[in-house]
Structure formats: C-alpha cells, structure tokens
C-alpha cells in the first residue's frame, strides 16, 4: 500500500484516544484561551495592567521553557498515562484558585504552578502522542485535526464565558464561574485519561530500565544533531512570536475604535476559536494539496501575514474604518492558526522514529514557545510606552518583519527536507540499533492502543 493512502486513524480505538488528547490539550489551557476574547475583562478581574499581564505571561513562559528542556528525556522514557492525567488534575486545582484572587504576588505564584502542571512534561507528551497516532504522511492532517478540535472546545469555553458575563450583567462573577467550571472539567478529564491512555512506551528496551535510559539518550543524540530539527523549531518560533500579538488585536479595536465590549468579545471569539475551526481542520489537507506538505504551507502562511501585516501598518497610520481593520486582523488570525496547525508536523515528515519523537518535540517546544517568555511583555511595553496608534503601528511592523524571517527559514527547511532527510534518518537509526544491540520492528502507538482495547474487550466479555 502506498503510504499516502493510509487512513489518519487506523481504528475506532485510536480515534477515541485522539479525542481524549484533544479535550485534555484544550481544557488544560482554559486560562490562555480566555485571553483571546476577554482580555479586558480578565484585567478587570485581576485588577492588573497590560504590562502586569505581560509579566504574568512571561513568568509562565520562562517556567515552562525550563521544564521543556529539563524533562525532555521523560517523553520517550515514560508513557502518556504517566505524564498526562496527574498534571491535568493539578492544573484543574490551580485554575480554580486563579479565579479567586486579585493579589498580584499570588497570581505570579499561581501562574508558575499552572505552567508547571499544564506545560512542563504535559504539553510535549500530548504533542508526542498526537505525532505517534498516525503515519508520517499524515502528520499535517493529524496536527490540523488537533488544532481544529481544540478550536471547537475553545469556542465552547469562550461562548460559555461570554454568556455568563452578559447574563450576570457584565459582571466579573461570570469569569469567576467560568474558572470554576473549567477547573472541574480538567479534574474529570484527568481521571478519564488515566483509564484511556496506553501504559507502554515504544522503546525496544521497554522492560529494562538501564537499557531503556541508554536507548533514550542515544536517540536524543541522534535526532538533536539534525539541522532540520533546529530549522523546524526556528520556523515555529516565528509563528508563535506572531501569535503572541493576537491578544492585543482585541485591545487595538477597544482603544482605537471604542467598540462595545460585546462586539469586541464576539470578534475575539470569531478570530480565535472561529479561525482554529475554519482553518486548522483542513490545514493539513490544504498544505499537502497546494503547498506540497506542511513546510510549504508554513511558507504560504508567512507570505499572507507579511502582506496583511503591512496593510495593518497603513491602516493604523491613517486610522481607517473599523470594519476594514477587523477584516485584516481576521485574516492575520486565520493565517496564524493555519500555521499553528502545521508547525509540529515536520518532525513526523522528516522520518523520525516514533520512539524518539517525544524528546525531540519537547526540545522543539522549548524553541517554538520561547517567545512566550518575553513576547507578551514586549508587546505590552511597546503599547504602554507608545499610547495610541503609534504603539500598534510598531507592533504590526514587527509582525511583518517576523513574517519575512519565517518565510526565509521555511523555504530553507523545505529545500533540506527535499534532499532526502527521511532516508538519512533511517540509515542513522539502523546504525544506532546495531551499536546498542537492539532488534525487532519499530513499535507503533496505534498498535498498542488496539492491543489494549482488545484486551479490555476480552476481560469484560461474558
């Protein structure tokens, strides 16, 4: 069978496992989801400025970047059942308390804990499990489905939050209730994940702890020497840097056009959740058909953000009509979510074995999400330090510059991968196995899921 004809999900059990990952991956980021549509209200709830919010996001980013690197090796050494459920439960507890305080020092502490539980080992484990769910040829599709599915959940989250906010007379009590509901769901999902996710790893030395550690470290040495791994991370870095400006699209409309709070919230939901649903779901299929794969799709996305970013520079300068600004901002948001759905797909497309994908994705997460440790604060300082249109003009110009850099890196990565990266990786893996005395076929996560599902059926059948 041709690799391209393989289904995205090999069985119903694999699909159900993926749906659990989608739910966990979005509810774990409930607080971050709210900022896209309700940042002004969140600032009111916590009684903080945009700069203080930027500090909170920078703290969050610094902490999770440290843990991405420190815990990279555990991604291949331990199973998803070990890495995901407990973090979901503890993240739920932290989310509950975030809706109960206005003390900035307490908020700083809670953001540290939220980053520990909902990022650290958790997020790379989710990404790694998603990458292992399907064949290398389906990586753009599976990550597009992940991002689109998360968008559906985010739409539900933000719609509920806005509904509570409006129903309770535009009171921050609605936000507090939303924090409580999301916290409860996170705890429940943590319990469900414990029973659903597979308990085995994909290592060939899974039953020997010492040899398993050697295999993981050898795999990390092999994969992290590949220039393509770092290039793909740099492309994702540019995507995420641009993404961090999105919360300030809402404040731009609020400050420049003084639109009603409800109208701005609706725009925020449409541009974030709507963008993820409308664009992310088909992104892998679009990238494969129109751009020759995920890397080509990333280049196309940067070309669009470059054009629209420059357009927003002009619109901010002349203070154009609000509807025109909203159309351009919506276009940038859609391009960002198109790229976000693709920026981890190259790690599967370049032929990295599933058993070594976790640690690579953890290091990639460090690179990709590095802007979260400084970019939110940087944008806030630019906007607070340059009130009015001047600050936003600088922000949109910076988005254009980042798009140029990202486009260049994506084109470079595509050229290298076209020169035979997958073949070179396969040869190096054969040499690694020979050096360690490892034998046997490569394990697949989908096979482990099906085996566990069949075992459960036998145990519970009459």
Residue ranges of predicted features:
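Cytoplasmic helix-loop-helix junction between adjacent transmembrane helices
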Residues: 110-149
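Extracytoplasmic gate region of multi-pass secondary transporters
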Residues: 35-39, 154-161, 226-280, 340, ...
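Glycine-rich segments within core transmembrane alpha-helices of 12-TM secondary carriers
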Residues: 140-165, 365-376
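Flexible cytoplasmic inter-helical loops of multi-pass small-molecule transporters
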Residues: 194-221, 419-433
